[in-house]
Design a protein with these regions (language model features):
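Proline-centered loop/turn at the N-terminus of a beta-strand
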Residues: 31, 80-82
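ATP/NTP phosphate-donor binding region
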Residues: 1-59, 100-115, 126-136
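Short glycine/serine/threonine-rich phosphate/pyrophosphate-binding segments
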Residues: 15, 67-72, 181-185
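N-terminal glycine-rich "phosphate-gripper" loop used for MgATP/nucleotide binding
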Residues: 62-66, 73-76
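Catalytic core of DAGKc-family lipid kinases
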Residues: 91-170
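Short gly/pro/ser/thr-enriched loop/turn and capping motifs at secondary-structure boundaries
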Residues: 40, 89-94, 190-192
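Gly/Ser/Thr-rich active-site loops/lids in small-molecule metabolic enzymes
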Residues: 162-192
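Redox-cofactor binding/interface segments in oxidoreductases and associated redox assembly factors
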Residues: 6, 62, 70, 174
Length: 192
């Protein structure tokens, strides 16, 4: 039996109608973990602290938009937990399953009729005087920008410890193949 964490975006799933529908469909077919904040729903699931939701999960199902996946991508990558996205947003590049197709897609998933698409991620480190100030992983992009009203900022970009370029600018955007699609569309270009 698959162990599945379910994370809804409650601003897109009003009243958690689709989350309830998903849980009811999964009941008896999978072990389900969901944030204890939703215990008032009285669903037949394992309620756990939000910070522990991925501790027992083999898979994550997200109900929301691409932003909901992006919030969890780094943690899931670190734990090697595949993410299945159910689109409640507008475009849904990463949340590829439309809500009307949810039961069919989940049935295939439960029968192991799926492939896992691996996506490149970046590790970013923000350094000042060669000391790491901040470090994180990104699935979409890394954006460095100056504070409003400040002058241009000096940046040095390196990959795997090798200097690539130096920039003096008001910002820099570095996108993965996943993130570049959004920038292409914003500029009136095609889906990449």
């Amino acid at each position: 039996m698959k162990r599945i964490a379910v994370i809804p975006n409650n601003s897109k799933d009003i009243g958690l109608v689709n989350t309830k529908r998903l849980v009811e469909f999964l009941n008896g077919k999978a072990e389900i973990y969901i944030d204890e904040a939703y215990s008032v729903l009285g669903l037949n699931v394992n309620y756990v602290a939000e910070s522990e939701i991925l501790d027992n999960a083999e898979y994550l199902i997200v109900l929301g938009g691409d932003g909901t996946i992006l919030q969890r991508a780094a943690e899931c990558a670190k734990r090697k937990i595949p993410v299945l996205g159910i689109n409640l947003g507008k475009i849904g590049f990463m949340t590829e399953i439309e809500i009307d197709d949810m039961e069919d897609a989940i049935s295939k998933f439960l029968q192991d009729d799926f492939t896992i698409e691996k996506r490149m991620m970046m590790k970013a480190e923000i350094r000042k005087e060669n000391k790491i100030q901040f470090s994180f992983h990104a699935l979409n992009d890394v954006v460095v920008s100056k504070v409003a009203g400040e002058k241009l900022i000096y940046m040095e970009l390196s990959t795997d410890g090798v200097a690539v370029n130096r920039y003096t600018a008001d910002g820099l955007i570095i996108a993965t193949p996943t993130g570049s699609t959004g920038y292409s569309i914003s500029a009136g270009g095609p889906v990449v």
